[in-house]
Amino acid sequence: MTISWFGHSCFRIESKEGPSAGSGQASVLIDPFSKDIGLKPPRIKDDLVLITHNHYDHNNIEGADTQTTMIIDGPGEYEKKGVYVRGIISYHDKNKGQERGLNTIYVIKTEDIVICHMGDFGQDKFEEHQLDDIGDVDVLMLPVGGRYTIDYREAVEIASQIEPKVIIPMHYKIKDLKIDIDGPDKFIKELGLTPEKVDKYKIAKKNLPIEEMKLVLFN
């Protein structure tokens, strides 16, 4: 499996199809953004596109062929090409969505690896069912930039509750991004792990860390 990051909360996951689907490749794109945020949007060529919430920096499906691409934009259970997706309702803020609306957490299973993308999670704590619905996670994609989401301290607390094998921070300030949020440094320091820096992250079930959590930071 290969994970690529386009900036902000946008990732592409490329994996082998599930055994029941065939022997080809499957591709999942999460939270494609508008060029208005200052970054170059990815071209959509994927089997599935997941939208965590309906804001311009997460919901740009322009150019997607809806005949071949499954667009998922809310809670529920989905499957295509042996990639299994579960959407879990959450809130974009600490006031039950009254400030910024709803957010969908996605749990994706492919190649026997479980990836959780938290979207613009803004709650200060999980509701009772949410942690159970998320379940065991191998790779956690977690917002850390604050202001519109949880901040770096809250992100560390959320990570400690989910207990993933790998953490990939997202939704933080990078060059050219026009959104005013924090960079990743405070989160990295608070977490206390030295990041493995990558251009693309290649991972297999057999290579997942067993004892210690790993922090992966995209260049």
Regions found by a protein language model. Give the residues of each.
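Divalent metal-coordination and catalytic microenvironments
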Residues: 13, 49, 53, 85, ...
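Active-site-proximal beta-strand elements of phosphoester/diester hydrolases
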Residues: 2-5, 27-31, 84-91, 105-107, ...
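Active-site metal-binding motif and surrounding structural segment of the metallo-beta-lactamase
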Residues: 34-77, 132-141
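Short Gly/Ser/Thr- and charged-rich N-terminal loops/segments
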Residues: 18-25
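Active-site-proximal loop/helix segments of hydrolase catalytic cores
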Residues: 94-162
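Portal/gating segments that form or line small-molecule/metal binding sites
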Residues: 63-116
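Binuclear metal-ion centers of metallo-dependent hydrolases, dominated by the metallo-beta-lactamase
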Residues: 3-6, 99-100, 166-219
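Active-site metal-binding loops of divalent metal-dependent hydrolases
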Residues: 32-34, 54, 90-92, 119-123, ...
